[in-house]
């Protein structure tokens, strides 16, 4: 009921807080950071209405360490946006945080940026510019490595500087990590937005979110569209440590 319009009250859904490792010869990136080591403290920074029940798992840093990953390979964490459940795990990652100017400003001043301000203190904030052309229907882009393997596209709407991250693998597979344009694959498959109240509470510009959602829906036959919080959306992506990492894995 609360994920998309038209849901049933008794529907039960698992919401994920995830991080995705994308490897590249010129340096690796994490897309978002999931839950962190100081999760309880981060939850206390939230308004009570936003304190949903959660299950604690291993942090992205713990999972990287468990497989012997060399963290010095990380260029940083590329955040789809700075809401708490996407940045909490930055608390144990001393690496640059990649974000847009609009998102940095939002995170530094908005009430929804309290956890971001806590975990980003003392860390490098690496802003990137919209220096590339429209990309797959989105109005502007930034090519991280200059080879089309990781392209960030301007989305906005959920937050002022929220983005979609497109990853193209050597196999030809393509993924679109759409952040919170929708929380569940139902939003893509049923072309369904969030319920009205959730749009009011969660989005800074619900109309722009709808535009981004429609753009994502149009790509679903050529791109694996991955809403951040739908566990099943990550099924095609190997879990870190389960197979040799080649291009991307989810901690």
Whereabouts are the PLM-identified features?
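Conserved beta-strand hairpin/beta-sheet module of binuclear metal-dependent hydrolase folds
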Residues: 1-62, 164-179
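Core dinuclear metal-dependent hydrolase active-site scaffold
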Residues: 18-23, 29, 38, 132-170
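Active-site metal-binding motif and surrounding structural segment of the metallo-beta-lactamase
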Residues: 44-99
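Cap/insert and terminal regions of metallo-dependent hydrolase folds
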Residues: 50-62, 171-251
